[in-house]
Amino acid sequence: MKHVFKYLDFAEDREHAESVATKELKLDHVEKFAIRDLANDIKERGCVELVQPGGFDELVQIYEAGGDGIEPLNCGIESRKVAIAALLRVMREPDFQCLEMVHEIIRIARDLEAPVDAPLDC
């Protein structure tokens, strides 16, 4: 029996939602790198920065300006790291306002992400 997530009924892009709505989430190279990089940050600092509302503002400005040496691939990695930190925040503070914030953060992260087939040169 195939597992179906209830959120599909409310998805903005149902076709995309159905394509990723599985119990097993296959990670692409950008996602694997972002998780490893986040784990290294945690190992070095012992914590992860919890995202506040507007946490993407600086990253978005740099990305749009095309400066500061940050390319779309790096923005994709950084945006995933921020989104993961936001999800960890929801685990700690599962209030409605926090859920709205994370929804907004993840929407912005999707806008900043590099194409999955982009080569990873790190």
Swiss-Prot record:
This is Uncharacterized protein YffN.
